[in-house]
Regions:
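Membrane-embedded helical hairpins/re-entrant loop segments and their flanking transmembrane helices
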Residues: 1-5, 176-250
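Early transmembrane hairpin of solute transport permeases
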Residues: 1-110, 242-254, 258-285, 292-300, ...
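Hydrophobic core segments of alpha-helical transmembrane domains in multi-pass membrane transport
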Residues: 20-28, 53-64, 83-93, 106-120, ...
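Inter-helical loop and helix-membrane interface segments of multi-pass membrane transporters/permeases
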Residues: 25-47, 68-69, 76-77, 85-122, ...
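C-terminal transmembrane helix-loop-helix hairpin of multi-pass membrane proteins
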Residues: 118-124, 167-179, 303-457
Length: 457
């Protein structure tokens, strides 16, 4: 392109899928193996994870051929608002709590990041703010006793990757793909949509990448990971605007690859994690979350701001549901020897006017819900009511398929059930009919974009 300011797409482990595959695939597989007296339940869990990773990569690869059409049909506010909600809830809020739990390290490093990245100043000598924050944070963590958090590691050496094709074939023949299809398919689809949103985020920051090859390589990388023993899919990562604002360009991704390869294959990653605690760098991650959230407003038309706000709410609700369940586990519920999660929780939370049923419903497929609500809102703002109704009916269809809002109770969690979520499907259908009838049941209350009754987006 001749440009010197292009930032490469971030790439790494998909955190959402990691937790889904650990707790909804690998743990059940291990427990089932233990109940049948298998000789090596841990190996059974690993093989089930391999199949899940391979399946996710295949879905991502196939999805790359249709993803650009979805992207063109979806307003930018809908794509970016979902990332905004994830950035605020699952990135910024978690690290904000940690910052104020350990204020000496947290607030000091946050001040440095605010000074250099929000204030647009540099330290004398050309020292980058991120390096200063991590170095000072590490020093303060050791002085205050936060570090080290564990005993000194040992076992450095050379550990080259080994293909596990035979194990993967054995896992496929064992039928794990069919057993855990209800988890693999939704996670694969979520990865496709999430990657789409991150590509849109990169374009909003000034770096346009083609959708098909980006997602295709993403899927191929995930399948390659499974061939070498990884249970966790890779993804186009959230955070491109933050990395670009840090000064990262095309080379940072290559350097990341070389560095992570070196420390992982030599076993030295454990030493780095021991010496440099998470607290030392959490201000940078907090800042990246803020930048991602801000971009959703800065890179979209001003009058679409309500759509962005509505689109980020399901992700915040999902984060709230996770926090509520973590609190219940901390109190002993869902833990060994404690009471299981049951439907009685809905009534118990209701006594404090907490509608936890809604939070659990929003948690399932919140990436789809966020995108659809924001897209429908954009259409309503622009008075394209037929388009808004189509988005609502898409949500109704996803509800019938169980990809959003449908959940079931497990002793330790609430998880996606893939059963029809009829109440929500009906609600979305009626919502769509309301928008469809808008031209006959409403009158203009003020100036705005002309109504478009076409079915285009």
């Amino acid at each position: 392109t001749g440009r010197s300011d292009v930032c490469a797409l971030p790439y790494g482990i998909n955190t959402v899928s990691l937790f889904a595959y650990v707790f909804l695939v690998m743990l059940p597989a291990k427990m089932a193996a233990e109940s049948t007296g298998a000789a090596d339940p841990a190996r059974v869990a690993w093989e089930a994870g391999l199949v899940a990773c391979l399946g996710s990569g295949l879905i991502e690869f196939l999805g790359s051929f249709v993803a650009e059409r979805v992207r063109r049909a979806t307003p930018r506010a809908a794509l970016l608002s979902t990332l905004s909600g994830i950035a605020i809830g699952f990135i910024s809020l978690g690290f904000l709590l940690r910052t104020f739990a350990r204020p000496i390290v947290g607030l000091t490093t946050l001040g440095i990041i605010m000074l250099t990245y929000f204030g647009k100043v540099r330290f004398k000598g050309g020292l980058p703010g991120g390096l200063v924050a991590v170095a000072l944070g590490t020093l303060l963590a050791w002085i205050t006793g936060i570090a080290p958090a564990a005993a000194s590691p040992h076992g450095a050496g050379i550990f080259l990757p080994v293909p596990v094709i035979g194990d993967l074939l054995h896992a496929l023949m064992s039928g794990y793909g069919l057993t855990y299809m209800a988890v693999i398919v939704p996670m694969g689809l979520f990865n496709v949509v999430g990657s789409l949103q991150n590509i849109e985020s990169a374009e909003a920051a000034g770096d346009a990448y083609k959708t098909m090859p980006s997602l295709a390589v993403n899927g191929l990388g995930t399948m390659a990971a499974a061939l070498f023993g990884s249970c966790f899919p890779t993804t186009i990562y959230i955070g491109h605007p933050g990395w670009k604002a840090l000064g990262a360009r095309a080379g940072y991704s290559v350097l990341n690859g070389f560095f992570m390869t070196a420390v992982c294959l030599t076993g030295t990653l454990a030493y780095i994690a021991w010496a440099v605690p998470i607290d030392a760098g959490m201000a940078i991650v907090l800042w990246i979350g803020i930048v991602i959230a801000a971009q959703a407003f800065e890179a979209t038309p001003r009058h679409h701001a309500p759509a962005v706000v509505l689109g980020l709410l399901p992700a915040l609700a999902a984060w709230g549901a996770m926090m509520a369940k973590n609190g219940l586990r901390a109190a002993g519920m869902g833990m060994p020897g404690g009471p299981p999660f049951t439907e009685a929780l809905i009534q118990a939370f209701g006594k404090s006017d907490t509608w936890i049923h809604g939070a659990f419903a929003l948690e399932q497929g919140f990436i789809f819900t966020s995108m659809i609500l924001a897209a429908a809102t954009v259409a309503v703002i622009e008075r394209r009511f037929v388009t808004a109704s189509l988005w609502c009916w898409a949500a109704a269809a996803l509800s019938v398929m169980g990809l959003i809002h449908s959940y079931r109770w497990m002793p330790t969690d609430t998880v996606m059930s893939l059963r029809p979520a009829w109440p929500w499907a009906a609600g979305y259908a009626v919502m769509g009919l309301t928008f469809l009838a808008a031209r006959w049941i409403t009158t203009e209350a003020g100036a705005g974009p002309a109504e478009d009754t076409s079915s285009g987006a």
